[in-house]
Amino acid sequence: MERRLANEAEWPLATQLAMIRDAGFDGAGVRFIDPAFAAEVTSFLRGHGMIWQAQCYPTTVDDLKPVLELVARLGADHVNLQPNVRPYRLQECIPYLEGWRRLADEAGVAVHVETHRDRMTTDLFFTLHLLDCFPDLRLTADVSHYLVGREFAWPVDEANHALIHRVLDNSWGIHGRVASREQVQISPGFPQHQGWVALFMGWWEYAIRSWRRRAGPDAILTFLCELGPPPYAITGPDGAELSDRWQDALVMKDMIRTLWDRIVAEDARSAA
């Protein structure tokens, strides 16, 4: 919820949390690399019956240990791990993933590895090779980076859909932003973006349906509306963003809730 406006102050943390609560979000992503910050935010969320994911960015296997210790104290639905390493060879990734998975198992905490820019998972094909090595690897899917990174031809063909679907079939959480094949974040409200909105809604529907087939009856699927400030957000010549990201996030929340409700209703009719 950073604003990064030259002529306006950032919203205070208390204001941000109240906005999230009052807008009807179920929870938030919380940086667990700062214990004091995490304690303050999770105290608010817990007090209002909300949930959270613990976000971290380890550069070593042992970097995950204090995060898991903090989760043991503060709780979390799961740890969202951005693998902040960039090995050139697949074999160099294996010790990191094996180590993080071992620590997660020992702690009894679910850890999801995020597909993210400038991380181990930044490249689509490289990530698919990781899934070859770890078929049960739990991902948090932000597929905006893959659309831009591969610059898929438009309309996206079935072969490229299949590559994205494979990532989504390993995903236990979603980070949501709408991209085009050339911009990693675009407003879902602009008329010229509706083809891209439909593309991502289709991918997210696939992800939700895939997750519902795999998850237990009491499991929770988190969808984080993750709309970043500039340079993620596109700006005009005056440096101002072309859309209101907070309003875009509210629109995305409602779109996903509507999608979820439709899927649940369709599954219920099919089971009747």
Predicted regions and their residues:
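Acidic/histidine-rich catalytic cores of soluble enzymes
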Residues: E106-P191
